[in-house]
């Protein structure tokens, strides 16, 4: 009988996957080292805390890291970031690893799961990246979040119309939101415009597939009946 492959064997880094990701989204050697340390930690924690889908472990770099790094090309001057629902750290920890090279760079990671929040704090410590982890629910604690943000991000957290509602009170002149979305992005945009006046830009993901990035720099509320307004929260 063939032996079963161990979890450790499955989660070993794939150097071809790493090279492919760094060709798509090049970073400095220092940032590469921080990302390597982060992914090593993620593989260790994955055995006890489900941080990413197990099927994506062999493609951590292309499926998750490059997907996160591409946001930097859309906000090259952003230094103060906030990531809703950071989970296993994509894109929040990846962005923090990159911000370590910039004066004033900082990422606030918002996560409601205590175990995942503990992982995020350890990832910041191990990589020496500038960031703060807030154990919070993104829908109930907006007043606690930092002000003066340059960019707000989210990936696989909530429907677009809800994310826009969470981001709106945190956005100021010159700030933007970058939301990573999948193949249903057009339907989500249609739903979002029922509640919000936005002028979104859509960017196809550099990692291919059906991924999209929704870029928003202006949000106004649509004139809606009270019941519809409550649904947008």
Curated annotation (Swiss-Prot):
Positions contributing to S-adenosyl-L-methionine binding: 85, 90, 155
Keywords: Cytoplasm, Methyltransferase, rRNA processing, S-adenosyl-L-methionine, Transferase
Role summary: Specifically methylates the N7 position of guanine in position 527 of 16S rRNA.
Known catalytic reactions: guanosine(527) in 16S rRNA + S-adenosyl-L-methionine = N(7)-methylguanosine(527) in 16S rRNA + S-adenosyl-L-homocysteine
Disordered: annotated segments: 1-25
Entries under HAMAP family matching the protein: 16SrRNA_methyltr_G (MF_00074)
Lineage, broadest ranks: Bacteria, Pseudomonadati, Pseudomonadota, Alphaproteobacteria, Hyphomicrobiales
Cellular component GO terms, alphabetical: cytosol
Enzyme Commission code(s) on record: 2.1.1.170
Protein name: Ribosomal RNA small subunit methyltransferase G
InterPro entries linked to this entry: rRNA_ssu_MeTfrase_G (IPR003682), SAM-dependent_MTases_sf (IPR029063)
GO molecular function: rRNA (guanine-N7-)-methyltransferase activity
UniProt record similarity statement: Belongs to the methyltransferase superfamily. RNA methyltransferase RsmG family.
Top-level taxon of origin: Bacteria
Major localisation: cytoplasm
Name of the coding gene: rsmG
A Pfam family of this chain: GidB
Organism: Rhodopseudomonas palustris (strain BisB5)
């Amino acid at each position: 009988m063939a032996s079963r492959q161990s979890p450790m064997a499955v989660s070993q880094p794939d150097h071809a996957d790493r090279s492919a990701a760094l060709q798509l989204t090049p970073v400095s050697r220092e940032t590469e080292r921080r990302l390597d340390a982060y992914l090593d930690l993620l593989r260790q924690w994955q055995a006890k805390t489900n941080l990413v889908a197990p099927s994506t472990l062999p493609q951590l770099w292309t499926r998750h890291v490059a997907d996160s790094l591409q946001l930097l090309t859309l906000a090259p001057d952003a230094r103060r970031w906030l990531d809703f629902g950071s989970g296993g750290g994509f894109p929040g920890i990846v962005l923090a690893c990159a911000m370590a090279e910039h004066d004033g760079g900082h990422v606030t990671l918002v996560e409601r799961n205590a175990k995942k929040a503990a992982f995020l704090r350890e990832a910041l410590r191990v990589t020496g990246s500038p960031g703060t982890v807030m154990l919070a629910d993104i829908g109930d604690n907006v007043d606690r979040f930092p002000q003066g943000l340059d960019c707000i991000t989210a990936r696989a957290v909530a429907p677009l119309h809800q994310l826009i509602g969470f981001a709106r009170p945190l956005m100021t002149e010159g700030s933007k939101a970058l939301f990573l979305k999948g193949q249903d992005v057009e339907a989500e945009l249609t739903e979002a415009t029922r509640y919000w006046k936005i002028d979104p830009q859509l960017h196809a993901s550099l990692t291919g597939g059906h991924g999209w990035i929704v870029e928003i720099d202006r949000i106004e509320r649509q004139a809606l009946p009270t019941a519809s307004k409550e649904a947008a929260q």
